[in-house]
């Protein structure tokens, strides 16, 4: 590996590569979330029978992981490059390894290991069979075959590839701190994100208004339930994302006891499951329009009616 790609160049190369494999290039979803999986472009589109191939960068906020910009590898906000392919291609692992070649990483010259790490997101009712991908001893990617999303069985099989962009870039650029990464020519990662890391950490751990957050969680939950009842799936899901982020802020602040924590997660999970069912019902009502094979589409609609 000779070329030390900037983080911007890494993103562009991944976009070009996965676009060539048939993925639509989506944009980051504009509501706070803890992982790219929580974007509606993955969470909602992974369920139901319609095909879906997409790739996008997703800034992911995890308040409890903030370290005031002082830790070289732990961040309040990191960036994921998310790929979802449904149905999963038989050669998805080969496609992934070829994507590393596009970044100048020859799998034959490096120690690349798929380490079993089955994935679960209890708060969203999600689980799958998966692996961490380790490159010369550093985890750079999470690879998952979804089994359950929003409490619903995933069929057809859907694969998710999630690159940790900061880790991947740290390896490619051979730096020990994410803040030393080159984002673009002459601009360091720290020039953009170090101060926000400090400020968000200070807010999350010291300054957030707990009473306000507790009130907001209840209000967001009420609004989500109301819009589920109204059949407005996407606005309802936005409020579930808001509940999730609000809970993460409360958790980082130490405002939630162990017993209360389980209760909050259960409340989020129940809403996510309701939305998953409502989304599939909405797509069925529209006739599963992304299924282009008419015979298959009619069979899928008949199967849904028989359930």
From Swiss-Prot:
GO terms for cellular component: cytosol. This is Glycine--tRNA ligase alpha subunit. Keywords: Aminoacyl-tRNA synthetase, ATP-binding, Cytoplasm, Ligase, Nucleotide-binding, Protein biosynthesis. PROSITE patterns: AA_TRNA_LIGASE_II_GLYAB. It is an enzyme of class 6 (ligase). GO terms for molecular function: ATP binding; catalytic activity, acting on a protein; glycine-tRNA ligase activity; transferase activity. Gene3D superfamilies: Bira Bifunctional Protein, Domain 2, Class II aaRS and biotin synthetases, domain 2.
